Amino acid sequence: MTYRSIGSTAYPTIGVVLLGGIANPVTRTPLHTSAGIAYSDSCGSIRSETRIYADEATHIYFNGTESTDDNRSVRRVLDRYSSVFEEAFGTKTVSYSSQNFGILSGSSDAGAASIGAAILGLKPDLDPHDVENDLRAVSESAGRSLFGGLTITWSDGFHAYTEKILDPEAFSGYSIVAFAFDYQRNPSDVIHQNIVRSDLYPARKKHADEHAHMIKEYAKTNDIKGIFDLAQEDTEEYHSILRGVGVNVIRENMQKLISYLKLIRKDYWNAYIVTGGSNVYVAVESENADRLFSIENTFGSKKKMLRIVGGAWHRRPE
């Protein structure tokens, strides 16, 4: 049977062991191990939607605007799987359309993973880890969104592999409150290109691997607090190194909020994560989520209640 299109959905991500440094701009293989979670809101409305469809010429659309895709990453993945499209659609020529909804950060992972979900929907016997390796051309941490829950992407700088550590159900007693600030984001490539200049980078690579192994141990006993406490420690190390090479992600009001969170911690547990953008993500036990969400002074940020969710998925081809 010949189809005309397939749609898919994937969810954005938050780093837990933060990634800094890629091997090269083409394969985007990470230089060291990292970890992350996929997130959305209570009804799954924070997401990336993708449609791949047969066409007379290839067009690539992001949020309704056609892109030249100058780095050719999406086009490269579509070309790589042209035989899959030919088998399903009767033609190798396809177009791609992606739309993001409410994403705070991690949209590249979601966009890449939604491509992977569509490809796997058309050819289920493909190895998802092989597909993930190709998706890295779009986003180096695409596996976080492709597999969902809590994942670790093990990497030695030459080869990378994403391992699913915990399903989202393991986090059912926890919520994440996002505090979104209106600061300009540092592009991920600025971080990747600068952090490797630090004299502390070799130690950072070692610590990231150690943190990932510790998270895997915490996961064995469902020590969710241990995982997020370590994520906060990782955030603090990571951004200290970035400041040392002139990349300041945590701006004034973000730091004020972080200081306030540490005061709140005397009353009830919380742990924060800052990745490369202008958001402070705060893990908290669900019983205290409303208390955290209702704090009056957010230092100019907007709040959003989040939860950890599963991997990317596809619809029935049409």
UniProtKB/Swiss-Prot annotation:
Thermal profile of function: Optimum temperature is 55 degrees Celsius.
Coiled-coil ranges per UniProt: none
UniProt signal peptide: none
This protein's UniProt keywords: ATP-binding, Isoprene biosynthesis, Kinase, Lipid biosynthesis, Lipid metabolism, Nucleotide-binding, Transferase
Family annotation (Pfam families): M3K_C (PF21433), MVD-like_N (PF22700)
Influence of pH: Optimum pH is 8.5.
Keyword Transferase: yes
Function, as annotated: Catalyzes the phosphorylation of mevalonate (MVA) to yield mevalonate-3-phosphate. Functions in an alternative mevalonate pathway, only present in extreme acidophiles of the Thermoplasmatales order, which passes through mevalonate 3-phosphate rather than mevalonate 5-phosphate.
Official protein name in the record: Mevalonate 3-kinase
